[in-house]
Swiss-Prot record:
Enzyme class: transferase
Record family assignment: Belongs to the QueA family.
Cell compartment(s), UniProt: Cytoplasm
HAMAP family attached to this UniProt entry: QueA (MF_00113)
GO cellular component: cytoplasm
Function: Transfers and isomerizes the ribose moiety from AdoMet to the 7-aminomethyl group of 7-deazaguanine (preQ1-tRNA) to give epoxyqueuosine (oQ-tRNA).
Name of this chain's protein: S-adenosylmethionine:tRNA ribosyltransferase-isomerase
Superkingdom of source: Bacteria
Length: 366
C-alpha cells in the first residue's frame, strides 16, 4: 500500500509534553464500527465483561540516553547516544549524534564533569558504524556493572517529538514508566500502559477482568519514520519478547470460554499475534519478532486494543488502521484532533474494537 494513505496533519499543540494526572484521567476515544464515543480511561472497566483478559507489557525502560565526548583525538566533540539494542554483556547498538564525527576505533567517555557512575567513568569504543547513523559500542564495563553505570549516567529516552521541545528531567523517570514495569530492557515505554493506576487495576479485577503480563522490550525503532513510498519496501525493526506457558494457557482457556483478549498497547498486540497459530491459539514465546501489520492482515489473537494516538505515516498508525479500518481511523483521528485529544506517548488513548470482530455494548448514552 502507498504510505501516503496513512498521512494526516497534526497541529503541534496536540502533542502532549507531560502525562495526564492522575494517569487514568486521560481521555479515551472508543471506536467501534462507525461509532465514536468520548470517554476517559477510568471508564475502561465499563466496556469490558467478566472473563475478558487484559494483556499488559511489563518491560521496564532503561536510562538509555547517554551524553559524553569523543576522547583520544585532537578535538573532543560532544556526543549523544541512544542505546537501542543489547548485543551481549558489554556491547550495545546505539544511535549517535553527530554520527559523522565518529569512525570505528574512536573512544567515547560518557558522563559530565562531576557526574560519574559509582565505578568511575563509563567509556566505550566504536566497533562499527552502520548506514543509518547506528553504531556498535563496546563498553568498558560488563553485565550488572554496565547496567548500573547506564542507570547512573543515563536519562529517560524520551521520544524525539518530546525531547526536541524540552529537556528530560527527574519527573520523566517516573512518568515514562508503567506501573507494571518489572523486566529491564526497553528503550521506549509501552505507552498505553502509562494510563493505568492501582485504582483502575482494582476496578478491573472487581469487574471480573483478568490481568496478564507479557514482555516485549520496546526498541527505538518504534519512533523511526517509514521512508519508503510503499509499505512492501519497509523493513520492520526486531524486538525481543516472551510469553510464558502459563499465560498462554490462561488466555487460550479464557477465549475458549467466551472471554475476549484486550491488548494494552501495540507492543502487546504484536507479541500476541506473533505467538498465535493460524487457528488463534496462543503459543509460549521467547524470540525476536519483526511482525509488520498493515491493512489486509488477519488478526488471530486480539479482539480489542487500547492504544495511544500515533504519528502520521508510522507503522503504528498502519497497525491500528489494519485493526479498525483505514477510513474509520482517519475519521477517528480527525475527531480526536477537533476535540482536543492529546497525542503520542504522554497523550490520550483510544479503545478499538476489531473491525468485523467482537460485539460491544455501550454502557452509557452517547
Amino acid at each position: 500500500m502507498r504510505t501516503d494513505l496513512f498521512d494526516f496533519d497534526l497541529p503541534a499543540e496536540r502533542i502532549a509534553l507531560r502525562p495526564a494526572s492522575p494517569r487514568d484521567s486521560a481521555k479515551m476515544l472508543v471506536v467501534e464500527g462507525g461509532a465514536l464515543r468520548d470517554r476517559t480511561i477510568s471508564e475502561l472497566p465499563q466496556w469490558l465483561k467478566r472473563g475478558d483478559q487484559l494483556v499488559v507489557n511489563d518491560t521496564k525502560v532503561i536510562a538509555a540516553q547517554l551524553k559524553g565526548r569523543r576522547i583520544g583525538r585532537e578535538t573532543e566533540p560532544k556526543i549523544e547516544a541512544t542505546l537501542i539494542k543489547r548485543l551481549d554483556g558489554s556491547r550495545w547498538q546505539a544511535l549517535v549524534k553527530p554520527a559523522k564525527k565518529l569512525i570505528a576505533g574512536d573512544r567515547i567517555r560518557f558522563g559530565n564533569e562531576g557526574k560519574v557512575c559509582l565505578l568511575g567513568h563509563l567509556d566505550a569504543e566504536v566497533e562499527a558504524k552502520g548506514s543509518e547513523g547506528e553504531v556498535t559500542l563496546s563498553f568498558s564495563f560488563h553485565g550488572p556493572a554496565l547496567d548500573q553505570a547506564i542507570a547512573d549516567l543515563g536519562s529517560p529516552p524520551l521520544p524525539p517529538y518530546i525531547a526536541s521541545k524540552r529537556t528530560p528531567d527527574d519527573q520523566d523517570f517516573a512518568d515514562y514508566q508503567t506501573m507494571f514495569a518489572a523486566n529491564e530492557g526497553a528503550v521506549a515505554a509501552p505507552t498505553a500502559g502509562l494510563h493505568f493506576t492501582p485504582a483502575l487495576e482494582q476496578a478491573l479485577r472487581e469487574r471480573g477482568v483478568g490481568l496478564n503480563r507479557v514482555t516485549l522490550h520496546v526498541g527505538a525503532g518504534t519512533f523511526l519514520p517509514v521512508k519508503v513510498e510503499d509499505t512492501a519496501g519497509h523493513k520492520m525493526h526486531a524486538e525481543w519478547g516472551t510469553i510464558s506457558a502459563e499465560t498462554a494457557e490462561r488466555l487460550n482457556i479464557a477465549r475458549h470460554n467466551g472471554g475476549r483478549i484486550i491488548a494494552v498497547g501495540t507492543t502487546s498486540l504484536r507479541l500476541l499475534e506473533s505467538a498465535a497459530s493460524e487457528d488463534g491459539t496462543i503459543q509460549p514465546f521467547a524470540a525476536e519478532t519483526s511482525i509488520f501489520i498493515t491493512p489486509g492482515y488477519r488478526f488471530r489473537a486480539v479482539d480489542i486494543l487500547l492504544t495511544n494516538f500515533h504519528l502520521p505515516k508510522s507503522t503504528l498508525f498502519m497497525l491500528v488502521s489494519a485493526f479498525s479500518g483505514l477510513e474509520t481511523m482517519r475519521r477517528a483521528y480527525a475527531h480526536a484532533i477537533a476535540q482536543g485529544y492529546r497525542f503520542y506517548s504522554y497523550g490520550d488513548a483510544c479503545l478499538l474494537f476489531r473491525a468485523g470482530g467482537t460485539e460491544v455494548h455501550d454502557p452509557s448514552p452517547p
